[in-house]
Amino acid sequence: MQTLLNFMSLSVFLCFYSLSVQCKLVEPIPVEMQLNPESMGLLDAGFPSDHLRKENEIHWQSWFYPGFAWPLNQLESRYFHAANTYGGGFSPATTLFLRFNQPAISNDLICMPPDCSKSKTIELINLTEGSDDYGQSRSVTATLSKVGFDEFESVLQVRPEGVLLKEKQTYALLVYEDFLKTPFQLQPSDVLKQLLSAQEPEVESDLHRSYQPLRQYLKKNPAHTKAVAAALVWTTGEPTKSLRDQVAHVINTSEKYRDYLIEGVDGELSTEEVCIIKGTWQAPLFLDKGPRLYAEGGLNLDPNGLVDAMEIRSIDFYLSIPQKAEMPTQGFPLLIYNQGTAGSATQFRTRGQVLEKGKTDYLTHPRLGNVAETAAEQGFAVAAMATYMGTEYCLKDAPYPVTAKTCPFVAYNPATPITVVASFYQMVLERILFRRMVQSITLESHQLCSEVASTQASFDPDLHVMMGQSLGAMVVGAAAATEEKPYQGIILSGAGNYGLGLALEFSKRNLGQLQENFLFLAQAGEITGNPFHPVWAMAEHGLSTANVALHLNRWIHSRELNTHVLVIEGTFDSMVSPTMQKALLKGLEIDMAGTEPADLPDSQRLVPEIETYGRQHKKCVSQNRKNVFTGKSFTHGVIQYPKDGILSGHHVAFQLPSARAQYGHFLKALKEGRAPAVGAEGCQSVSTNCSCNE
């Protein structure tokens, strides 16, 4: 028996010895990062990269994806033009790209913790000296997927994890020697060695100059130097500046846009709770032309690059005055409501709870549970206007015959990025001006319903809340983040980020697949299901100045933050995809409150995404966002409600009494001068604290 065991042991030893000898005979395949100092192409020296920018300028000099076939090369040029027309340099929200010089590397050969190595094989580091997170390591997700890069098989595509990158910061992507599994061996190229060398070259190139921050960092941290096999250095731009500059400009010129006419009481919309008054406002249109299918329609700019009204339109607006509440000395607190795509000015009164399936008039006929009456319960007046790209604009002012339902979606046409950005600017700027026009209004007794308790109606200049639904929520977010006069609170319902995903991931109909096939010649799901696809990066740069998440993220970390935030989301939203919901929440770096709906698929859950950027899920949140400059604390919370089975989750703010009660509590707290609390059902007095019944 012992002899048999000895024989078996010897056999196993010889077997392993034989394998090890064979392994030693396999030469590793060297892999290097493509670094061509003479090229301005995306895949020749990495993207984004500071060598593509002229010194002291934010714009870069290269196309996104040279060599792409028609029609993507046509779209690419439009997005590049949009980025350099309204953009502010490299977007903080984008995918990073670099190419290896071996064509046969598969995605399975990436070595990343925790599956492959105990140490980091790839990381992102902030190189901005003096920054709060200088030298801080950031985790990333990476792929070598060939989708979107058929001609270049080994393209490394990387997305930063956690909180968004910040504007005007220099970052480095560092890829280490053990990033690839055998038989491949990643190693620094001669060009990279020169770029990272402390020895100055005889002639300094743009590429060498762009790597200077990394050389300085490695000089202070020499332990990294030997292991770095690939690196990318770039500085994020300031895409939020463009819209902020335009907002500041229209505020300075707002007095010339305050002409209005009060037409009188709207008896059909008025109820025992609210008196509805209709008026018209002479509102500016800042676009040089409306979007015409594939024709771009941009902003009308003066010689200084600031918006100038192309024309003045007479548009409808409505005011809701509480019938039973006495007006406070300083005026009624004001809720400004912003409807969504194809919405009408009357939706603050007509959009309410639908009690049975199959109703098609849920946006046009007055219903209980509407914003006007919910706000009136807390003593708030409401103002709403006919927005650009709303139903009224489409039926009256659109530059071509079109139906009200299809007109607004022209503004989301992926083939016209200039229009996508300019349309968003128009909607934000008119909201900024509308607020100031409404503030100037005083209604006398003869202009009010006879049942109104007050003999006059005006509006408190220091208590403004803005609420938006769907696209309206995106506009509200951007307006709050760019306004010089803070809102006391904002309420975002059916909310998501503004960008390409509105078109490609429009949930109600399968429009994404149609656009993938028609515009991008891609297979269904090739783009919509793949955040690494270059089309997304193309849009993230081209549409960056209208990226609401970027505006909100800058705002929450700024001295200007002085506003409470409530976000109401629904499961299985038919209009806004989970991807766009999560992007907005990431921009806010917001905590989730309430009870997470049960039995959700992973794609619908918000909690995992919230945890990736360091926030929490609690039963109740209050005063959880601190302005580090002023020391003041504000409530920022999101609640996710289940759809009610009648309409999709896009409508929960109107369909569910619990959601209406939530924003009612929010308004009540603000009126009382308290910090609101956002909490689950069962929390006692959520307008004042977070005491909950377990």
Regions found by a protein language model. Give the residues of each.
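N-terminal signal peptide c-region/cleavage motif recognized by signal peptidases
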Residues: 17-20
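Cap/lid segment of the alpha/beta-hydrolase catalytic domain
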Residues: 291-312, 328-453
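Bacterial N-terminal signal peptides that target proteins for export
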Residues: 1-9
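Primarily recognizes the serine-hydrolase "nucleophile elbow" in alpha/beta-hydrolase
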Residues: 441-504
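Short, solvent-exposed loop/turn and secondary-structure capping segments
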Residues: 109-113, 134-136, 168-171, 182-195, ...
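N-terminal cap/lid segment of alpha/beta-hydrolase-fold proteins
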Residues: 263-330
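C-terminal subdomain of alpha/beta-hydrolase-fold enzymes, centered on the catalytic histidine
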Residues: 415, 419, 423-426, 485-489, ...
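Acidic, low-complexity Ser/Thr/Gly/Pro-rich repeat segments typical of extracellular/periplasmic
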Residues: 25-291
